[in-house]
From Swiss-Prot:
Gene name per UniProt: ribBA
GO molecular function: 3,4-dihydroxy-2-butanone-4-phosphate synthase activity; GTP binding; GTP cyclohydrolase II activity; magnesium ion binding; manganese ion binding; zinc ion binding
Pathway as given in its UniProt record: Cofactor biosynthesis; riboflavin biosynthesis; 2-hydroxy-3-oxobutyl phosphate from D-ribulose 5-phosphate: step 1/1; Cofactor biosynthesis; riboflavin biosynthesis; 5-amino-6-(D-ribitylamino)uracil from GTP: step 1/4
Protein name listed in UniProt: Riboflavin biosynthesis protein RibBA
Region (DHBP synthase): 1-204
Lineage: Bacteria, Bacillati, Actinomycetota, Actinomycetes, Mycobacteriales
Length: 425
């Protein structure tokens, strides 16, 4: 496994005017970009970038800068397969020659990052390619564009970077990949990080939720407090059903019974027997009610293990044709499980939870909640009922996704509801 450096080192290097290398996901470009802060651009840095990269130098900017400078899309309908938001190319209007030299491009980069610059300070077209980053950075789009802007902002600089893809020194005509990038980083004293690490760092160190409303909700299991949250960057709403006092004068936030439940319209609302989600939700509410203290956190945006409702219905079509729940996702070009629990962890922290007994049979959920200042002291099995419609689904979760589901092999379709088995979507 390739050795990586810390995000903290990368941020410090960016602040100091050094370049870093950022690798994206293997399922995306699987390439490493040389990145530095645009306001720190020098002729030497640009020359180094040109020497070891493709030479197609881009300057990622946040949306506010693009709007201020009148940087319009390069083409009305973006057809780039990764959605990179190219704008019209530019040169600095004054202080440069032809615009192509390292010195000229460094001047243009610094001007793009200058908060006092205006649209008329640039000529169009030019030799530098500004890119528009998504609001929310890598949390919205895991690309090098957003990584550059995030790193600059985290370093206390203007949200403007300079990026270009590093080319292979071993395989002429190809881009450099992970192992070669590590060697290159060591040779030149550069930090090497991944976009995944940057996403994880931001999720752990920044708050991305807002508590919006709280209301009393009487249910057949008793009364809960429904506390509504919005996710700042994802335009998704979540709700926590809270019973009893979690933290406060008479509670310390420890030993809280918690269920983090993934949204499932078909199971939770329509009572679909293809999954075990509805019975799990009902059982979790009942168990928290009996406990007298706990949280059932209902996570929106997790439909179909994160692939969305329409894709889930398409996956059902494939399952009806013989695929299992995992293979169906993969046949659609989607991950077997695309859920992220970072927002859920932040909500639990906001509610005052410090340590919990987690209601789940999915070990991955436990891993997904670790590392956010939360301590999971126990995994509590959540019983549900298997039936003829969901038994194959449950077995696939057990066999391919590692869910802890005991007793499924004893199921017989001739028996209507054979007993209770744990399952966690």
């Amino acid at each position: 496994m390739t050795r990586l450096d810390s995000v903290e080192r990368a941020v410090a290097d960016i602040a100091a005017g050094k370049a870093v290398i950022v690798i994206d996901d293997e399922d995306r470009e699987n390439e490493g970009d040389l990145i530095f802060a645009a306001e720190k651009a020098t002729p030497e840095m640009v020359a180094f970038m040109v020497r070891y990269t493709s030479g197609y130098l881009c300057v990622p900017l946040d949306g506010a800068i693009c709007d201020r400078l009148g940087l319009l899309p390069m083409y009305a309908v973006n057809q780039d397969k990764h959605g990179t938001a190219y704008t019209v190319t530019v040169d600095a209007r004054n202080g440069i020659g032809t615009g192509i030299s390292a010195s000229d491009r460094a001047t243009t980069m610094r001007l793009l990052a200058d908060p006092t610059s205006v649209a008329d300070d640039f000529t169009r077209p030019g030799h530098v390619v500004p890119l528009r980053a998504k609001d929310g950075g890598v949390l919205r789009r895991p690309g090098h564009t957003e990584a550059a802007v995030d790193l600059a902002r985290m370093a206390g600089l203007q949200p403007a970077g300079a990026i270009c893809e590093i080319v292979s020194q071993k395989d002429e005509g190809s881009m450099a990949h992970t192992d070669e990038l590590r060697v290159f980083a060591d040779e030149h004293g550069l930090a090497l990080i991944t976009i995944a690490d940057l996403i994880e760092w931001r999720r752990k160190h920044e708050k991305h939720i807002e508590r919006v409303a709280e209301a009393r909700i009487p249910t057949r299991h008793g009364e809960f407090r429904a506390i509504g949250y919005t996710s700042i960057y994802e335009d998704v709403e979540h709700v926590a059903l809270v019973r009893g006092e979690i933290a406060g004068p008479n509670a310390d936030g420890d030993d809280v019974l918690v269920r983090v439940h993934s949204e499932c319209l078909t199971g939770d609302v329509f009572g679909s027997r293809r999954c075990d989600c509805g019975p799990q939700l009902d059982a979790a509410l009942a168990m928290v009610a009996r406990e007298g203290r706990g949280v059932v956190l209902y996570m929106r945006g997790h439909e179909g293990r994160g692939i969305g409702l329409m894709h889930k219905l398409q996956a059902y079509q494939l399952q009806d044709a013989g695929a299992d729940t995992v293979d169906a996702n993969l046949k659609l070009g989607l991950p077997a499980d695309a859920r992220d629990y970072g927002i859920g962890a932040q909500i639990l922290v906001d509610l005052g939870v410090r340590s919990m007994r987690l209601l789940t049979n999915n070990p991955a959920k436990r891993v997904g909640l670790d590392g956010y200042g939360l301590h999971i002291i126990e995994r509590v099995p959540l019983p549900v009922r298997a039936n003829a419609e969901n038994i194959r689904y449950l077995m696939t979760k057990r066999d391919k996704l590692g869910h802890d589901l005991a007793g499924l092999d004893d199921f017989h379709e001739s028996v209507h509801l054979p007993g209770e088995f744990g399952g966690a979507l």
